[in-house]
């Protein structure tokens, strides 16, 4: 008879049953409070495959998020013959962001800021309502780690098989399984790094250049960095990123309140825990049979029965594992489940308080999100298709001409954010008497044409004759430059100053 590995024997031997037909898994909570140490070496976690509602939700979220990430750069959007047709493109060369019909210029980065603020507030709101649900389901670290574990499970088997393989000597079987696993991880990491650079240039064009070796060196460098990062963080580091590198577990405590839904162990129902023998009643004991299925499926290596912990990402796989065991032993579901702090901490036998969605913290985050969204909508509706900047000459501030006139120079930049050529006229206001001229034009009010999607800079000179100098306000007189669209009459106004002696 072949001697079994200790781990396999613990799960299959009748002597270690937690209940009739339910094996007690010999698993250690690697990240438990009792074993946590700043200088402790890492103990590898072997999460077991879970089945149930929350695992199905995680499969769905993983498929959707990965699908969006890998496919989005390949989607096309027709913007005309002179513009890129990639649906989402962060075009650094032309300083623009394209997202479907939306086109954001570098001068409009406040929209990106608004999106980031909305995202942060949304994260705060989700945390206040349901804990670290973002971490457990949609965080890129979680999604890619989950994907790497799927690949590892495909080549090496589930928890017991992987543990047995790691403990075995370096045989041919171990070598090819480990090699296949790491090669698969590298291919996933390479695809991830390659797709990421596609967000910054036309995907089909850059893909061909990468294959033929004609892509810019910076594309290969960043692709290599992202490939290495994905392989290291998703395949090797895994839970260490969440525990030690990510600041969010430390911040989240400030986002909770007594009504936040968290994955929790109901100790008043589960204790005292212990194996349940055949024919034994459930009186004077808890429903927890100490099978440790919740620990075995946890990707963070914690024991949820120890209470709320920094390492818990609220993935709820322990709920699926526990519900499966409760079904087998014919006990009510929900020994581990989503519940609020006030219900978890309530004395045994006290009535369960209903969830309050309307509360100050939730209303604050929701109100701020509505406010930011409204401001962004207003800014978008008021968005101008013309951007004007006026840069006065600094050295010198002014020039004294031979006839005694004072002349100031200004560089006027006109940005046409439309896809059609536009013509503008310049106006000057605020001086008692002046002469204006534009370099390269016969008259100051000559039409200035600006090409589509382009910036044109013109040099403007404004001179004040000697008789009018006495009427100027000190050394800096307010001056207004107006740019008017000849076709539709749109006017953009910029204030500056006319410098004279005394400035």
What are these model-derived regions, one by one?
Residues 2-272, 319, 332-369:
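Membrane-embedded alpha-helical bundles of multi-pass integral membrane proteins
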Residues 127-142, 234-249, 278-326:
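Cysteine-centered iron-sulfur cluster-binding motifs in ferredoxin-type domains/subunits
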Residues 374-398:
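Hydrophobic alpha-helical transmembrane segments in integral membrane proteins
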Residues 399, 430-442:
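Short aromatic-acidic-glycine turn motif
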Residues 414-418:
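Asparagine-centered strand-capping/turn motif at beta-strand->loop junctions
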Residues 419-434:
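Short acidic, flexible loop segments centered on an aromatic residue
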Residues 439-468:
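Intrinsically disordered, low-complexity Pro/Gly/Ser/Thr-rich segments with frequent PxxP/GP/PP motifs
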Residues 464-503:
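Terminal connector regions
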